[in-house]
Structure formats: structure tokens, C-alpha cells
Amino acid sequence: MLSSKVVGDSHGQDSSYFLGWQEYEKNPFHESFNTSGIVQMGLAENQLSFDLIEKWLEEHPEVLGLKKNDESVFRQLALFQDYHGLPAFKDAMAKFMGKIRENKVKFDTNKMVLTAGSTSANETLMFCLANPGDAFLIPAPYYPGFDRDLKWRTGVEIVPIHCVSSNGYKITEDALEDAYERALKHNLNVKGVLITNPSNPLGTSTTREELDLLLTFTSTKKIHMVSDEIYSGTVFDSPEFTSVLEVAKDKNMGLDGKIHVVYSLSKDLGLPGFRVGLIYSNNEKVVSAATKMSSFGLISSQTQHLLANLLSDERFTTNYLEENKKRLRERKDRLVSGLKEAGISCLKSNAGLFCWVDLRHLLKSNTFEAEHSLWTKIVCEVGLNISPGSSCHCDEPGWFRVCFANMSDQTMEVAMDRVKGFVDNNNGGKQKRTMWDTRRRSLINKWVSKLSSVTCESER
């Protein structure tokens, strides 16, 4: 007999968000070896500025050689480490986070808890702030992985704060109160609000007015405020990034023990494989408990050593942040212009590694069933893995998250060519031969049958 965790289906793996990934992994596009494969546009990964980091590593071979002042530090890094983390690394992280926020916020390393990525950080916070069956309110659309990260092992429930396209998905007082009341009607004990700023999947930064509203709301309700700020260094256009800590400081709530921030180097530096994340909190009990829990997901000492040196180079970090934002802006503009040529529009965005794309005009009907059918066609026939809005708990059918920073310029052009061919074909034009060939139709049909078993209701 296995545990309920093993035999249950609460992980969320049957979401279209994960199903699209599975199909991509079976048949990934390659510019030379598999030009008819699926292009991965469902992965929020930043590969646009790797060359800057690689150049720095070439110029600092002693870091990869695990040396300091020409002496080996291998032994001290290889032995057991205090799970509070290397002081040099925490100092460097504090300065880097401050630089992103233009030093309007200062970070105290004693209030930091290092974790193996933001997934671990968010889950650890749920363990610290809520009991099984308690609820957190999250603005929707939201990152599909939260259904796994926040709920699966903790037993915490998520109640969506319904935001709408008509006002650019702004968080409103009415939407907050509605979510809170819905939670109470379901006998859920609301423990806090969690936001992603900038938003995943919208690619927009939360405004100062929204943050002020959120802090007033959580303070009035006496609940926690969690701000996941892993995309804070990707804001490439106005309005500039504003941290919840900055607004809290202005509201004389700077030392509030119910305000917590999550950060990671996965998006800003494009290092998800390094598994570097952290929790920042003024709450001593949260910091203490989270530090103990971090022993289940530590950052390797070698990784901390490398990044402490990298992030301590002020000239490098300044240049990297500026150049990375420039490249993100250019790539986003290329995606938006390519989609526009095909008659497709996007939500106006200023941050992140993705766009929130409006395909409502391509739906056969204004339903999530129609969205699911369109998504299946885009993955199967067009060969693009994108994330449907229903997987992000969007209330309106026809919106999709499309990632743009995890591929080369050449692959982006292939994707845009496929989109245009698909739209032309839908409009009665002739579909281009960049789509799937006849040889693979039988495989597609088998997969369509599998996808059809996933109902829209289960994804919402």
C-alpha cells in the first residue's frame, strides 16, 4: 500500500501546461537536426545573455577552478556547510537585489533564507504561514506551477483573485474582497495573498497603487503578504519595477512581520539549473523555521562560491542588467511585431520572458472547450508549445502565454513563420510547408486523443 500522495492526482501533471511540455520533449525542434519538431514557447527561460556570463567566466578561470588568491578552496567547499549559507554569497545577493531596486530597499542578510530555487522558497513559505486546508489568494491569471508548488505537499488551497482583460488585469479592491468572501463561503481560513511581481504570465509589473491596495487589504484582514519577485530584473520598459518592500517602507510598514519576498536567479540571470532562491522576511520565527527547513534543499557550496564572485563584480552586474533588459525588449518587440503581421495582438507588457497573447478571434466559440481545441491544433499542427489561459486559471477563453527568451533569433523566425502560415490557412490561405509532415500524422492523432481526455474544468 502506497501513500495517498503517491496514488493521488493532486500534483497537477495532467494540466495542459505540463502536457505540452511532455510532447515537446518527445519531439524537440532543432535548427539543424529536427526542423519539423515542436518549438518550445512554453518555457520561461532566459537564454539571451548567456554570452555575458560565459565571457566573465573566461576572464575569471580561478573561480571555476575553485581557487581564491591562487590557493585552492576545494576542501572548504567540499565539506559540510552551515545551512545559513556562505556569508560572501548572501552579501553579494543582498547587494544585487538592492541594485535591481535602485537601492530604494536595503536587504539584511540575517533576514534571508537560502533555498534551492523559488519553487522551494514558495513551498517553504506555505509550510511556515499556513496549515493544510488554509487558503492563499492569488491574482489570476497566475503561473500554472503554483498549483503544484503551493498546494501539492502543503495541503494549502488557492483561491483566485479574478482579474479581467478589460482593465489590463489590474488588481482591484472589489476583486480582492470577492476572493476573500468566496474563500469564507467555502469555510476556508485565508492566511494571505501571494502575487508575482512582475506577473507571470502577463509580463506586466505591479503598480505602486496596486501594491498600496494590497498592503492595506492584507493589513486590514491581518493576513500575510507574499511577493514573488523573481522577474524583478527583467523590467525593460516603463513603469519601472517597484518592490512591495519599497511601498511598505513608505507606508511605515517596513518592519511588518507579515510581509515576505521570494527571489531567485533563475530568470534575471538565466540560471534555473543552479537552483538558487531565497526568502526574505522580517518575521524572526519564519526565518528561523524556514532556515531549518532549508536543510532539505540547500544550494551547493560550489554554486554559492561561483556566484558570490560573479555578483560581487559591480561592473559586470551593472552592464549585465542593462544589456539583458535591452535584449529582452528587442526580443519582445520582435515577437509582438511578428504576431501583429499575422493579425494577432498582445497585452501591453513591460517585463518578463513572455507575452500574453490574444487569440480570441481564432476560437470557434467563446468557450474553454474551443480554447482547448485551438491549443491542441497549435501544438499538433503548427508545432508550437504555448500555454493556454485556462492552465493559468484565466476567466476568459482565448488568451495564451507565449515565451520568447529561450530560443535563438533563427528559431524565433521559424516560430513566426509557422504562426503566419497557420493564420493564413485558417483564413483560407495555403498553409506553408514548415508545419508537420504527413509521416507524423498518426502520432499526432494518438496524442490528440490523449489531450481530449483533459477537460477544461480540470484545468481551471
Curated annotation (Swiss-Prot):
Give me the reactions it catalyses. S-adenosyl-L-methionine = 1-aminocyclopropane-1-carboxylate + S-methyl-5'-thioadenosine + H(+)
Q: What is stated about pH in the biophysicochemical properties?
A: Optimum pH is 8.
Put simply, this protein is called 1-aminocyclopropane-1-carboxylate synthase 11
User: What is the superkingdom listed in this entry's lineage?
Assistant: Eukaryota
Functional note: 1-aminocyclopropane-1-carboxylate synthase (ACS) enzymes catalyze the conversion of S-adenosyl-L-methionine (SAM) into 1-aminocyclopropane-1-carboxylate (ACC), a direct precursor of ethylene.
Q: How does it assemble?
A: Homodimer and heterodimer. In vivo, the relevance of heterodimerization with other ACS enzymes is however unsure. Interacts with GRF3.
User: EC?
Assistant: 4.4.1.14
Modification N6-(pyridoxal phosphate)lysine occurs at = 267
Query: Per the similarity annotation, which family is this?
Result: Belongs to the class-I pyridoxal-phosphate-dependent aminotransferase family.
Q: Which residues bind substrate?
A: 45, 83
Q: What does the record give under GO molecular function?
A: 1-aminocyclopropane-1-carboxylate synthase activity; pyridoxal phosphate binding
Q: Could you give a single Gene Ontology term from the biological process aspect?
A: fruit ripening
Entry keyword set: Ethylene biosynthesis, Fruit ripening, Lyase, Pyridoxal phosphate, S-adenosyl-L-methionine
Q: Which organism is the protein's source? A: Arabidopsis thaliana (Mouse-ear cress)
Q: Which residues form a coiled coil?
A: none
